[in-house]
Amino acid sequence: MMNELFGEFLGTLILILLGNGVVAGVVLPKTKSNSSGWIVITMGWGIAVAVAVFVSGKLSPAYLNPAVTIGVALKGGLPWASVLPYILAQFAGAMLGQILVWLQFKPHYEAEENAGNILATFSTGPAIKDTVSNLISEILGTFVLVLTIFALGLYDFQAGIGTFAVGTLIVGIGLSLGGTTGYALNPARDLGPRIMHSILPIPNKGDGDWSYAWIPVVGPVIGAALAVLVFSLF
């Protein structure tokens, strides 16, 4: 069990370090990759997911996502007694990963005066704030993610191909569905760094948009549950 928890912790740490690292590189001032755009962010997140799964896959199932963890438990693939420890490990990894992003880009954070840009390197936010639409966006994106992960399990792949497919899937979801909310798809990916945004001493950071914070938590869990329901028909 400890190996599995360490795998979930380490994998989620790598996920946030690389994923929010690319966001910081695109958004924060005076970086080499500043203003390189949404396609770079989606590609970066796809690579981040693939690398994180490769790193942690020998230690744990590499769920790295509370919504996926709950979905697997609903499907009967994980004992419910393991769900909370997995989620806690994922949140711990996400929070430490975000601290490393902050350390990596500290001079650039200090040069940034726009509070919205700073928050964007920690957590997601909607392009247009609309509670119902934003919630649907997170539900749909996570539904596609979890259903596809389950479907991939029906096929025999050579080692690593499934992981590459999931990374590609993240890019696809980001390009197709992610432009509305920034596609959290993962409660730990959003809430863990959002908590660190409130804690870390960053000039001009503003607030953490906590009125929105429930959507990237609840939406992915609903999406994962719907994916379990649909997959039961396969």
Curated annotation (Swiss-Prot):
PANTHER family attached to this UniProt entry: AQUAPORIN OR AQUAGLYCEROPORIN RELATED, AQUAPORIN-9
Motif (NPA 2): 186-188
Database matches in NCBIfam families: MIP
Cited function: Mediates glycerol diffusion across the cytoplasmic membrane via a pore-type mechanism.
Pfam families, per database record: MIP
GO molecular function: glycerol channel activity
Domain-related comment: Aquaporins contain two tandem repeats each containing three membrane-spanning domains and a pore-forming loop with the signature motif Asn-Pro-Ala (NPA).
Organism per entry: Streptococcus pneumoniae serotype 4 (strain ATCC BAA-334 / TIGR4)
Motif NPA 1 per UniProt: ranges: 65-67
Chief subcellular location: membrane
InterPro entries noted in UniProt: Aquaporin-like, MIP, MIP/Aquaporin
Keywords: Cell membrane, Membrane, Repeat, Transmembrane, Transmembrane helix, Transport
Name this protein carries in UniProt: Glycerol uptake facilitator protein
Residues that span the membrane, as ranges: 9-29, 37-57, 61-81, 83-103, 135-155, 159-179, 214-234
Catalyses which reaction(s): glycerol(in) = glycerol(out)
Highest rank taxon of the organism: Bacteria
GO cellular component, one term: plasma membrane
Its membrane topology: Multi-pass membrane protein
Localization in the cell: Cell membrane
Family under the similarity heading: Belongs to the MIP/aquaporin (TC 1.A.8) family.
